[in-house]
Amino acid sequence: MIMKVHQVQEKKMNKTYYLISSLAPKSESLKPLIKKELNKKLVEVDDPTVADYLFINGGDGTFIKNAIKYDRAGLKIIGINGGSLGFYTTFNETNIDQIANNLDQLKYTQLDFIRLQIDDQIHHALNEFNINSTTAYGYDIFIDNEFYQKFRGTGLLISTTTGSTGINKSANGAILFPRIKAIQMVELYPLLHSSFTTIQSPIILPIDTKIRIEIKENYCDHDACPRIVADGAVIRQGLSSTTIEISATRSQADYVATTDLRSYIQRLQKTFIY
């Protein structure tokens, strides 16, 4: 039974949880099993903004979307693999029955997000920001206010350590292991010829680095102008004559730490090799 907020306040000793599940068949089949296990130790509430724990049952896409949406201090977020990819998940169908007993033993940490500011708007991403266009476009790139290069191509990808196994990997970026505190920038399809070239390599920057991207061209068809995609969702389109500022920031919520080398390597092997 889901308890209302006022009912929970009468039972302050009980830790509370809210469960989010994707609509994937695997996720739907796991949902009743997860609730049965969680109800052994926690009280379910109908409002995620008052829960002590947020459980996300699905793949990495479901996890990322809701981790950004519900990020707040005091919340612990735990992923359960009810989808396909599960780099952010701690439990799956083989060990759901161990969730309740392991809650107090789990190690938690804050995650690195990427903060992007354009005009007066601020956005956050857990995996990456993808600045791209359908045609080659010019960008002036600055690193900590030092001019880095003039880039012309279809876009730039800026990712976190945890996001390095996502689109970043598909774009030939490096996979960063969990204990590496960094952000990574990858060029997307640079335009190269005898009078114009770029570094053409991913760069891995210290976590406190600030990146500034200046788009100076103010002429293009709206559909061909650069757009900004945050973790797969388009947040701005038709960019011209503007400046984008990017830096890392810490999440407010706590997540299960994934610093164990062996388990991370096994996850890489299972996902990309075997």
Curated annotation (Swiss-Prot):
Active site: D60
Catalytic activity: NAD(+) + ATP = ADP + NADP(+) + H(+)
Gene3D superfamilies: Probable inorganic polyphosphate/atp-NAD kinase, domain 1, Probable inorganic polyphosphate/atp-NAD kinase, domain 2
Highest taxon above the source species: Bacteria
Cysteine disulfide links: none
Cofactors that this protein relies on: a divalent metal cation
InterPro entries (alphabetical): ATP-NAD_kinase_N, ATP-NAD_kinase_PpnK-typ_C, NAD/diacylglycerol_kinase_sf, NADK
One Gene Ontology cellular component annotation held by this UniProt entry: cytoplasm
Residues binding NAD(+): D60, G61, K65, N127, E128, R152
Compartment(s) of residence: Cytoplasm
Single GO BP term: NADP biosynthetic process
Predominant cellular place of this UniProt entry's protein: cytoplasm
Alphabetized GO MF terms: ATP binding; metal ion binding; NAD binding; NAD+ kinase activity
Signal peptide range: none
EC numbers, comma separated: 2.7.1.23
One Pfam family from the record: NAD_kinase_C
Role noted for this protein: Involved in the regulation of the intracellular balance of NAD and NADP, and is a key enzyme in the biosynthesis of NADP. Catalyzes specifically the phosphorylation on 2'-hydroxyl of the adenosine moiety of NAD to yield NADP.
PANTHER family for this protein: NAD KINASE (PTHR20275:SF0)
Name of this chain's protein: NAD kinase
Gene name of this polypeptide: nadK
